[in-house]
């Protein structure tokens, strides 16, 4: 309140001065001035002398002063009365046309006098360079429009705090600050800078508690009670020297300054007379070196004026405080040039930020030892090679609270932890206790469902990979625990939820992660995959098991189809074999037919010589050789055909041998292959209707697919198929309802080793690991990580793998099952038997067709025979009549011839050669050859013609066997009725 009242008086005084009738004169020139007055409001005569000497030396430094330019100093003494200071600035500095003012003051006199100089000079746009003022108020450019300083403000120490926390790896802190402007400024600076600072470092510090107190403390006990219940034991304090004494006094009474507690304080608090041992504090380098800051401020001003002269025209500075209309634009431009300076001075690297505050200021890190001795243990200084600030700490020189040499953990480490897990075979098996059970088995641990509001009894027992890991961890790093199951059975994912009474969406975690983020649990020991989304909100130990993502599917069925015996050859090869059989048969037939030794028989050849090969016999021969059946007949006769037959036999031998060998490979040693080749399988990337794949909703695998742009199409397809738990998905894979389940490789490899019908497809992708989850900034993170690394080195993790995941005996049985030849059964060879059955049925069918066809042919032949018999009978009747007529005519002529005693002539008769035809001989008359009567008699059937007088007995034809019912001969005139040729 006093400071605000004083500021109002300063503003009133500045207004009074502005209306004084002193008279104003403006000066503008096209050329830059050759002389420049630099004002100084200094605290003592020594500073005034040094200011005068510095400007005198500056005039001889051609690097900063152009030719024909001279600097002059105009100084006044800083008055503790700010109103007097305002009048002195107007009368003794502005009236002398000063282009800038350098101001310093005694640290004990307060900062009101520099503020008066800043107000007055700023009204006329005259730059003011402070060399001792460090209050946060001077950073407000709405008030101190032309003020910049070669010393940093107090609240810039927050930057050094962040460097120290990063160096000591402290992740959780408590900030103690006063409620004044500087106290709130340092808190704001810490929170703002940490947002960008921690983007470049691995360790992020969070503020667990903020303690704000009113200045001029009398007691700090009430705040210490809250601080003691917090987890953090690192205190960052901004307080005045007087307030720091009260805080240290009360903190000592609560034993909060001893072993395990870390205090990092600002410059003012470091000078308290009761600062505890082990406190770390900051001290600005050259903080009390007015000479160094005077020199740096003068040279910064000279550098800015030189650059401004080379770039633009500088108007003369204002000369009168009475002219309120003065607007010195050159002063505003000069202030911008000053802020852009970056030079190496006596106090280090001198540069300014947008507020005109010094940056690159160096700090000493002070460690308080016994009897309030200050010991330098580090520096925060500018690194010219990297062009940035760098922290250097000698850790071995630090004495911590309680006179400890070892760095405290910085947090209160609880020894009894709330540990959560989740059912996930083989890492965690969950068993419900029976009604008659009162305790779990020795290798099990009680694990009730986690419910903060319901103290349920231990109804479940847990065992497995993670439980054994938890038991061993608790032994190694010495903590006790209460184990509980996930409240909703999920690992957890974040959802957007509306805040009550607000329009904004808030990201909220569920499941195990949610309990850890909300600090309702201390640790998660489960197959928890490490991924970026989770690592942003919780801590992870180093992986206790490395794994990735893979695909689980059911093996293709090993049962053979009815045409399994055809598998050794491809369809193309079978077609070629079938074509080859008939082509070879055709060529054999042609070779045997056109061979001179195949078709024609020799004249002297035996009648039993084998006949030439016909086409049907050639086909039979080709098939017989191919099927290795005996060939009893129908073999090639020619040499060329027999050569081809031998070649065909060799071909058949190779084909049959190859078929037999491949048949064994397909039916006896067949090993099923996976359907999918991996995540890059085209059927997964372009999912078809008959291929379903899924994962678990909200899991790490689900998050992985969301991150991968190239898998977005696949994720959109599978999103609707995702399951709530992995157990449900695995059961559906076994039942064949789900073709591919995408999940952590450790679980799927376990399932595949347990069930020989399951197999993992393709290579691992999305490689990661399982880690122990802890709260952000948990004190157990490092201890758990180091212990897990020791477990890896000692072989303990490998032992857990063999015991719980791989199940060596089961996996060996699966491999034995895969390598054991299948015993051929009816299912394997059913096709062959069916083929034989088809052959038998075909043969029976063909014989039935043949019988039916034969019956039809017999009936047809019978009808033809009847018709032929009728025709023959009719023809016989006609011929008989013709024969009788011819016989009568011949007899008459014969009789006439006898009477004329002429020798008999030749006649042509058609007679039946035999009375009874031979078997198979066609019925009907045959044409006899022309001849005499004797010829006729010789061809007639034995008949006694002596009675008829036609043939005398002397012909010697009487020797005939007796005939019953002798029939007369039938004469036929050779199928013609013309008998004119007959000669008697």
Swiss-Prot record:
It is found in: Cell membrane; Postsynaptic cell membrane; Postsynaptic density. Residues 1-24 form the signal peptide. Glycine binds at residues 527-529, 534, 700, 744. Residues 592-648, 850-984 are cytoplasmic. Residues 974-984 have a biased composition (Polar residues). The chain crosses the membrane at residues 571-591, 649-669, 829-849. GO terms for biological process: behavioral response to ethanol; calcium ion homeostasis; chemical synaptic transmission; ionotropic glutamate receptor signaling pathway; long-term memory; medium-term memory; olfactory learning; phototaxis. Gene3D superfamilies: 1.10.287.70, 3.40.50.2300, Periplasmic binding protein-like II (3.40.190.10). PANTHER family: IONOTROPIC GLUTAMATE RECEPTOR (PTHR18966). Forms a heteromeric NMDA channel with Nmdar2. Belongs to the glutamate-gated ion channel (TC 1.A.10.1) family. NMDA receptor subtype of glutamate-gated ion channels with high calcium permeability and voltage-dependent sensitivity to magnesium. Mediated by glycine. This protein plays a key role in synaptic plasticity, synaptogenesis, excitotoxicity, memory acquisition and learning. It mediates neuronal functions in glutamate neurotransmission. Is involved in the cell surface targeting of NMDA receptors. Plays a role in associative learning and in long-term memory consolidation. This is Glutamate [NMDA] receptor subunit 1. The gene is Nmdar1.
């Amino acid at each position: 309140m006093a400071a605000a009242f004083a500021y109002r008086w300063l503003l009133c005084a500045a207004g009074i001065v502005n209306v004084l009738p002193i008279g104003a004169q403006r000066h503008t020139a096209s050329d830059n001035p050759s002389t420049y007055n630099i004002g100084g409001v200094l605290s003592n005569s020594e500073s005034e002398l040094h200011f005068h000497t510095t400007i005198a030396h500056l005039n001889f430094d051609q690097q900063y002063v152009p030719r024909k330019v001279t600097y002059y100093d105009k100084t006044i003494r800083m008055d503790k009365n700010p109103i007097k200071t305002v009048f002195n600035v107007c009368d003794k500095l502005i009236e002398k046309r000063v282009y800038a003012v350098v101001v310093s003051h005694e640290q004990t006199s307060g900062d009101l006098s520099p503020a008066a100089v800043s107000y007055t000079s700023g009204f006329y746009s005259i730059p003011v360079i402070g060399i001792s003022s460090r209050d946060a108020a001077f950073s407000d450019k709405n008030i101190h429009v032309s003020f910049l300083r070669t010393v940093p403000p107090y609240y810039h120490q927050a930057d050094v705090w962040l460097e120290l926390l990063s160096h000591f790896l402290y992740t959780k802190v408590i900030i103690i600050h006063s409620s004044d402007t500087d106290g709130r400024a340092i808190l704001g600076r810490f929170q703002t800078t940490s947002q960008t600072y921690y983007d470049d470092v691995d360790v992020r510090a969070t503020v667990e508690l903020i303690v704000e107190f009113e200045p001029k403390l009398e007691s700090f006990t009430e705040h210490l009670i809250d601080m003691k219940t917090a987890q953090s034991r690192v205190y960052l304090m901004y307080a005045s020297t007087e307030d720091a004494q009260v805080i240290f006094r009360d903190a000592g009474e609560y034993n909060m300054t001893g072993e395990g507690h870390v205090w990092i304080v600002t410059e003012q608090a470091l000078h308290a007379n009761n600062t505890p041992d082990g406190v770390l504090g900051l001290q600005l380098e050259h903080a009390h070196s007015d000479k160094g800051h005077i020199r740096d401020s003068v040279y910064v001003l000279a550098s800015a004026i030189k650059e401004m002269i080379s770039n633009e025209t500088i108007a003369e500075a204002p000369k009168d405080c009475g002219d309120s209309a003065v607007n010195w634009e050159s002063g505003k431009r000069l202030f911008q040039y000053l802020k852009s300076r970056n030079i190496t001075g006596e106090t280090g690297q001198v540069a300014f930020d947008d507020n005109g505050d010094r940056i690159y200021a160096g700090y000493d890190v002070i460690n308080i030892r016994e009897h309030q001795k200050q010991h330098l243990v580090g520096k925060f200084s500018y690194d010219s090679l990297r062009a940035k600030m760098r922290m250097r700490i000698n850790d071995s020189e630090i004495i911590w609270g309680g006179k400890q040499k070892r760095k405290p953990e910085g947090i209160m480490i609880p020894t009894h932890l709330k540990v959560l897990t989740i059912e996930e075979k083989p890492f965690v098996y969950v068993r419900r206790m029976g009604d008659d059970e009162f305790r779990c088995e020795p290798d099990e641990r009680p694990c009730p469902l986690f419910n903060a509001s319901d103290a349920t009894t231990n109804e479940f027992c847990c065992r497995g990979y993670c439980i054994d890991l938890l038991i061993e961890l608790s032994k190694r790093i010495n903590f006790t625990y209460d184990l509980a199951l996930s409240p909703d059975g999920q690992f957890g994912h974040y959802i957007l939820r509306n805040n009550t009474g607000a329009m904004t969406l808030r990201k909220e975690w569920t499941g195990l992660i949610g309990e850890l983020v909300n600090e309702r649990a201390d640790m998660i020991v489960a197959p928890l995959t490490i991924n970026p989304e989770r690592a942003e909100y919780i801590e992870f130990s180093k992986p206790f098991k490395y794994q990735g993502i893979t695909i689980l599917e059911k093996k293709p069925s090993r049962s053979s189809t009815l045409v399994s015996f055809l598998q050794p050859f491809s369809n193309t090869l079978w077609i070629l074999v079938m074509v080859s059989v008939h082509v070879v048969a055709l060529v054999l037939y042609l070779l045997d037919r056109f061979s001179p030794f195949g078709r024609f028989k020799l004249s002297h050849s035996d009648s039993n010589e084998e006949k030439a090969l016909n086409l049907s016999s050639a086909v039979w021969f080709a098939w017989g050789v191919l099927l290795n059946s005996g060939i009893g007949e129908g073999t090639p006769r020619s040499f060329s055909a027999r050569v081809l037959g031998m070649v065909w036999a060799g071909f058949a031998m190779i084909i049959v041998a190859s078929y037999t060998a491949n048949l064994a490979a397909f039916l006896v040693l067949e090993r099923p292959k996976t359907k999918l080749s991996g995540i890059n399988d085209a059927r997964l990337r372009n999912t078809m209707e008959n291929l379903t794949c899924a994962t678990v909703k909200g899991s790490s695998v689900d998050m992985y697919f969301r991150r991968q742009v190239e898998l977005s199409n696949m994720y959109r397809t599978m999103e609707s198929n995702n399951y709530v738990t992995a157990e449900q998905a695995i059961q559906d894979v076994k039942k064949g309802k789900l073709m591919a389940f995408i999940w952590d490789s450790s679980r799927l490899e376990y399932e595949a080793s347990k069930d020989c019908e399951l197999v993992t497809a393709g290579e691992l992708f999305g490689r990661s690991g399982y880690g122990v989850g802890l709260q952000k900034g948990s004190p157990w993170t490092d201890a758990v990580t180091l212990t897990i690394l020791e477990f890896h080195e000692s072989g303990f993790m490998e032992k857990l793998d063999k015991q719980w995941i791989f199940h060596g005996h089961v996996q060996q049985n699966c491999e034995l099952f895969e390598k054991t030849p299948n015993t051929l059964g009816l299912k394997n060879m059913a096709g062959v038997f069916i083929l034989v059955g088809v052959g038998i049925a075909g043969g029976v069918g063909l014989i039935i067709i043949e019988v039916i066809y034969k019956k039809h042919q017999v009936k047809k032949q019978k009808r033809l025979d009847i018709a032929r018999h009728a025709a023959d009978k009719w023809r016989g009747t006609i011929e008989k009549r013709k024969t009788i007529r011819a016989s009568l005519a011949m007899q008459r002529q014969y009789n006439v011839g006898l009477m004329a005693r002429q020798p008999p002539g030749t006649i042509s008769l058609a007679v039946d050669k035999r009375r009874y035809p031979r078997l198979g001989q066609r019925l009907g008359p045959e044409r006899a050859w022309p001849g005499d009567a004797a010829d006729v008699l010789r061809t007639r059937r034995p008949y006694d013609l002596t009675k008829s007088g036609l043939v005398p007995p002397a012909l010697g034809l009487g020797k005939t066997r007796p005939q019953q019912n002798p029939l007369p001969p039938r004469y036929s005139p050779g199928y013609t009725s013309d008998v004119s040729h007959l000669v008697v």
